[in-house]
Amino acid sequence: MFLVPSVFGRPYLYSDSATVSVSSRIVAALTVHLQENILYQALSEAVRRFPQLAVSPAVSGSEYCFQPASGNLAIFRADDPDQPECFGDSRLGGYLFKVSYLHKTLFFDFHKSIADEYGMMTFAKSVLYRYLELSGFPLENDGTVKLMSSTYFSAEGDDPMEKLAEIPASRPVWYMDAEALRLTQHSAESERVVTVRIPISKLRSGLEQFSRTPVTYLAPVFSEAVSELEDPSRDQGKYVVASIMVNLRPYFPAASLRPFCTPVYLAYNRRLTEYPYNTVLMSQKKLLEAQLKSDALAYSAERTASLIEKAVDGAGTLEQKKNMVLEMHQQMAAHSTYSICRVGNIILPDSMQRLVTDFYPVIPSGNQAYALSVVTYRGEIIVSVSGKSDTWAVTRRFVELLNSNMIDAYLSDEYIFSPMNYHP
C-alpha cells in the first residue's frame, strides 16, 4: 500500500533540508503561454489518477508514514515572492509537491519521499498532456503518456525494492574503493544552475554509444573540471569521485513511480591532462560497467537499503531516528565529491513533443559540491549542473574540455534556483 513509505523514499521523511537535499524540480517549457485555470483542472485530475503522489507526511508511533492529502490543491506563480518555500506550508494543502508557472514554463517541485526524478517526470508528462488536450490541441497518445482516462493500478504505488528480493547480489569484480576528495560546503539556501546541451547529431564518428550511456563519457570530463578548479595540486591519496545515481528500472523493470535509484561510485583515477581521452574513457568504462551488471546493482541497492533500515527501523524515538538518518546521509556523502543522475530518454508523442520545447530535472546539490542531471530530449543531451559555489566556472571548464575532446557542447542557460525546504 502506498501509504507505507518505500525503502528508498523513507529517509527523506526524517531529513531536514538544512543538512541534505530532500527535493528536486522538473522544468517543462511550452510553445504557448500557460493559463492557470486550465492548468488547475489538469492537475486536479492528475492527483486522482496518481493517488500515490497525493499524500501528506504523518507520524505513527516513532515512525513517519503517509496519509491521503486532504487540503485544497493550489498553483502558484513562479515570480510571486510570497509563494510557499517549505513543504508543510498550509497553502500546499498537505501535498508533498508544488506546481508553479511563469509565462510558458512550468515547474514541479517535489519531495523525494514520494517519487524519484523518473517518477515525477511521468506525472508531469500526464499533467502536460491533459493541459494541452484541455487547451484544444489535437493530440494522439502513442502509449508513452499515462492518460487521465486510464486507471491507477497497485503496481504504480508498490515499493519497487520488492523486485530485488530474489535477485542474486554480489560485489562487482572491478571496483576502486577510493577516498573521495570532499570540498568546502556552502550554507547558501539557493543554488546556481547552469544547463549544457550536446546535440546528438553532431557527435563525431566513434561516439555512437554516447547517447545511450552519456554518463560514461561525461563523468570523467566533469571530474577533470572539478579537479582543476578545486584541487589543482592533486591532494595525494584522494580522488574526485562521482556518485552516480542509477535508475534501476531498465535493469529491474517496475511500474512504480516511487524512488528506485541506487548510487554507484566512479573514482577519477586517470587525468585527461596526463592521458588521451580514449585511455581515460576505457579505464572509467571498466570501473563503471562492472558496477552496472545486475548482480552488482542488486548488491548496491541492498547495501543502501540495509543502511536505511538500520537508521529507521527498530527501537528509538523519532528524534533519535532523525539523528541516525542524518549520520547515514553524512556517511554516504563521504564516499563522493559530487553526484550525477542519468534519468533517461524523455519520450513524448510527436503531437505533444512539438509543443514541449524543454523538459528536464534540476537536482539540488545538498551535501555534495555539485549535482548533475542528464536526460536526452528532442535530439539533445541536456545536462543541468547545480551547486552553491561557482557553478558557472566549473561548468564552463566542463564544456571547454568536452569541446577539446571533439564533443560539441554549449552553455545554454544560467539561473538561481531555491529548492523547497522541509523540516520534519
Give residue ranges: language-model regions.
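Acyl-thioester-dependent acyl-group transfer interface
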Residues: 1-63, 71-98, 228-424
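Non-catalytic, low-complexity flexible loops and terminal extensions
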Residues: 1-9, 102, 114, 118-122, ...
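Hydrophobic (often cysteine-bearing) scaffold residues that line and stabilize catalytic clefts
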Residues: 35, 116, 120, 214-215
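Hydrophobic recognition helices of helix-based DNA-binding modules
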Residues: 127, 131, 225-230
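Catalytic-site-adjacent helices and loops of nucleotide signaling machinery
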Residues: 211
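Short amphipathic alpha-helical segments
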Residues: 214-223
